[in-house]
Amino acid sequence: MFSSQINLGSVRDIDDSVFVRQASIGNPDLKPSTSSNQNFGLIFQKDSYKFSIDYWEVDYDDRIEVESAQALLTQDPFGPSITRNEFGDLIGVTTTYFNEENTKISGTDFQFDYIFELNNYSPISLRVKGTIFDEFLTPQITADGLSKMINRVGKFNYDSHTHSLPKKRLNAFMDWEHNGYLLSLITRYVDGYTNERPITGLGASLGYKNKVDSFLVFDISARKSIDLDEGNINFGIAIINALDESAPRLYDAPDFSFDTRVHDPRGRLVNLNLEYNF
């Protein structure tokens, strides 16, 4: 972790929101991270059904993490990583990598598979996969100077050295293959989460709130394979986010935008594909 880079980024200062220089530098004093893991699982299968569930825990010591410019500024607006001019205006924040003393993560993964048998046609396959985050505990220094473990699940986490952590994610896949055609439907769901960043009067007047809504999108696709004397041709069309759902709004002043780590803002996308194999 010795590389360094500089870019512009938005942060919320004491009484203003600004774009400033954010430098990220290496840390030669990093220690290797270690962890202990536990998993408990169950698999049930009968005929066309299959269900699996897995509970997991990971306990990290010295997990390597990169500092958040906003978290540094929130914790100490005049700290050693903060650069200001002679008038006190914020002009830069310097971040680096560090060893987080302790991190505890736990959650549950599950998967369900089912084959629908159709009398005179090919079967339809269904698969549902999901993850539920229970805990993502990281230390935080309280107002009295003590370290306290905070659960980051279900939060935007603008003020900590981590990122958004929706509690639930769910994906469902349905496929039907018949006479050389493959038809697919994919459903993607991301749970909503809270945003504890204070919202200004302007932001509230524009409809922003302290919750990022859940996000549900559907993707559909069709594919046709044609065999030739030498090789085959595959035609495909896919409509991503078929209902043209907009990314949930996120108040992250000075940005009035979306969560770049979680949501795709591009709306409906149409992809065409032609492939020749020989």
What are these regions (language model features)?
Residues 40-42, 51-53, 112, 126-130, ...:
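Membrane-embedded beta-strand positions of outer-membrane beta-barrel proteins
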Residues 1-52, 58-59, 85-108, 113-118, ...:
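Outer-membrane beta-barrel signature, preferentially recognizing the C-terminal barrel domain
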Residues 187, 196-217, 221:
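Generic long, charged, amphipathic alpha-helical segments
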Residues 1-8, 67-77, 142-151, 199-205, ...:
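Flexible, surface-exposed loop regions and adjacent strand-edge segments
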Residues 25-28, 94-99, 154-161, 204-210, ...:
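Extracellular loop and loop/strand-boundary signature of outer-membrane beta-barrel proteins
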Residues 56-197:
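Gram-negative outer-membrane beta-barrel transporters
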Residues 46-48, 59, 113-119, 124-126, ...:
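Outer-membrane beta-barrel proteins
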Residues 60-61, 134, 187-201, 224-278:
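C-terminal beta-signal and adjacent terminal beta-strands/loops
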